[in-house]
Amino acid sequence: MAFSKNILDSLPPLISKQIFEGFFGFEKENIRVDSRGKLALTPHPRELGEKTSHPYITTDFSESQIEIITPPLPSIAESLGFLETLHDLVSIELKDEYLWPQSAPPILPEREEDIPIAHFGGEFREQEEYRLQLAKIYGRKRQMFSGIHFNISLPERFLELLHEEGKQEQPFAEFREDIYMKTVRNFLRHRWFLICLLGASPVIHKSYRKHCIDMLSPFAKDAYHFPYATSIRNNICGYRNTQDFHLNYSTLTDYRESLQELVEKKVLRDIRENYAPIRIKTTTDPKRINHLEIRLLDLNPFFKTGVNPLHAEIIHIFLIYCLLCPEETSFTSKEQETANRNQEQAATEGLNPGAIICDADGNEQRLDKQLAHCLQEIQQTVSPHLPPEYRAGMEELERLVQNQASRPTDTLLKEIKQEGFTEWHMKQALKFLKKSHDEQFIFHGLRDMELSTQLLLRRAALRGVSFEIMDRQENFVCLEQAGKREYVMQASRTSLDNYISVLSMENKVITKKILDQAGINTPKGRSYSSPSEALADYPYYRGRAIVIKPKSTNFGIGITIIKENNRHDFFAQGIAQAFKHEATVLIENFSSGKEYRFFIVNDQVVGILHRVPANVTGDGTSSVQVLVTEKNKNPLRGRGYRTPLEKIKLEETEEMFLASQGYSFATVPAKDQRIYLRENSNISTGGDSIDFTDKVPQSYKDIAVRAAQALQVKITGLDMMIDSLEEDAAEDNFSIIELNFNPAIHIHCHPYIGKNRHLDDKILDALGFTGAEEAGEKA
């Protein structure tokens, strides 16, 4: 083809860097194991949905082998974030089981037939039959290797620009295909480079196939290895076809025909049996390449996702190198044989600097020299077009080549030697599980979005509901499953509520009038349309506890509480503050009691929360400062509204409030003595959220539902003041302050004290999104 890096060099730098755009996705396999590191023999968990219809969670060869799949996303970071979120969701749902973090299998049953093949019934029975055939050909133990598949598509607009700028005579479709095919050929030629640097399966447990164990040397307790191996998964003992075969990579048609010929000759049972290190993938149009699937990557057991983000960048850099580097010959059978031998050498001898690798001309070279040469080629070819965000990846690549001790295999061998194969990997599995629990409110890759939205999308992903982020800043998403589509904003603004109901909740005057008409108690008060009008009524409010607030407010903005209303200047300040935010202001009697947030979905109270100001409880020996530091270690606490609770601050405001009580940061509270650092109970200032769903009498819940029905709302957060939970609701012992049209769900899902009320699930239920299993039955 008439394509070289010279064409790329002729483009403006800002345009040439677009070559690093595209879409990215990951497929990851993990074996489920028990607490001893033995293969779990239990069925695929029902909590993970139906494996045949779930878009993100399924099984691979074995019923015990979970596969998680991300959708194509426009950056590696987003795709890895989605992968990590799926990993967290799966890990948390497992009961007394763990995700094995290593590509090499865990402790396997002695008899191969005891390894459960993934079960598929009904119309999907063929998938199980196919796996049974693979078991006969390869054995079940060989199929228990797991790995990472990295899916990458090249940027379409860049390819179009490249075609136009290069004044190519061939049609764009042919030009595009040529670029993809050239990239594949060069990847296959040089794949040994990635295996040598990124391999992470150097050791195998003794329960693996006896034929392979007999070839290996003892390494650690119950573990064996090739002395210089980087990736047993990629060598003669690993996950590969029974024989090497050569495909025609000239064009997509040639490739497909050569693959089909192997099926017709019974070399392969099915084209799915092509275990090549890279696959060419099409979708609805079989004549058009959609993306490339890189399949040679081991799980990196030092990372929860199995992927070092910098190594993902390295793979992308390497793929761009394969696109750009010159290609002098077609990928002949002889070249393919050389590439296969190089793969075997890299996988089996990759830690031996003196191992032999054949260069592009077929000449034998020392491995260390060829690594350095390949790095230099990549730097010269790719660096001029490297975006700033990929510089760390390039620097990591340089470290891996120049310092063998920095490679995952080298570090892994030291850990296994010291602790044991099973012991070390189980320690990693437990560490990752704890991290998953600690971060169970995060959608990785979407951490800039509201926490409530992240929670909703997490549960949507677990249910197999696909989603699109329509407006990231507005937290506006589209949910879709089995032909059903719903739009949601800020997790709780949905199609279930009509526009007039939202307006009624937004306008506090209207809210009060509607509730009054329904005979539901609200604070007595008046509305004012000018500061002078409100100030004129000061004599009426003097000496009474009042609340001054804008007509339309949220998050407590513009609200002033005056409990002893004896100073006109304080009253005037409150009026001025409220009118800064709204043209109409309410002045109401202050309602006594404690404030409770009722969350209502479809005429049901699904959560009730009480908020307590920032505080610490003494242990008799620690100062307030130490107690705050310790309390802030809770993984639910963070900064910037990215966690369910905020860290308690030790600043001037807290210092002044402590001083007003006769305390300081150095005060040592008595055991069980509670000291408050703030007067307001906002979560945003370090307050505690306490679940009261099961403690509030039913009479108050009934009133809350009546209030929601009066405004004809299906999802709302209702704030109610209650004098005492020891009494049932009466005419004078409660008051509804307001109803909110976009209430946060995260405070109910992860309270400081109490259980998760799963409001994310409740909203998905209300919208009609079932689990993946039920969706599959309906589809």
Curated annotation (Swiss-Prot):
Amino acids binding Mn(2+) 1: D719, E738
Residues given in the record as Mg(2+) 2 binding sites: E738, N740
Catalytic activities: L-cysteine + L-glutamate + ATP = gamma-L-glutamyl-L-cysteine + ADP + phosphate + H(+); gamma-L-glutamyl-L-cysteine + glycine + ATP = glutathione + ADP + phosphate + H(+)
Note accompanying the cofactor annotation: Binds 2 magnesium or manganese ions per subunit.
Positions bound to Mn(2+) 2: E738, N740
GO molecular function: ATP binding; glutamate-cysteine ligase activity; glutathione synthase activity; metal ion binding
Pathway listed: Sulfur metabolism; glutathione biosynthesis; glutathione from L-cysteine and L-glutamate: step 1/2; Sulfur metabolism; glutathione biosynthesis; glutathione from L-cysteine and L-glutamate: step 2/2
Keywords, alphabetical: ATP-binding, Glutathione biosynthesis, Ligase, Magnesium, Manganese, Metal-binding, Multifunctional enzyme, Nucleotide-binding
Claim: Magnesium is one of the keywords in the record: yes
Chain positions recorded as Mg(2+) 1 binding sites: D719, E738
PANTHER family noted in UniProt: GLUTAMATE--CYSTEINE LIGASE (PTHR38761:SF1)
Name the UniProt record assigns to this protein: Glutathione biosynthesis bifunctional protein GshAB
Species of origin: Desulfotalea psychrophila (strain LSv54 / DSM 12343)
Gene symbol of the encoding locus: gshAB
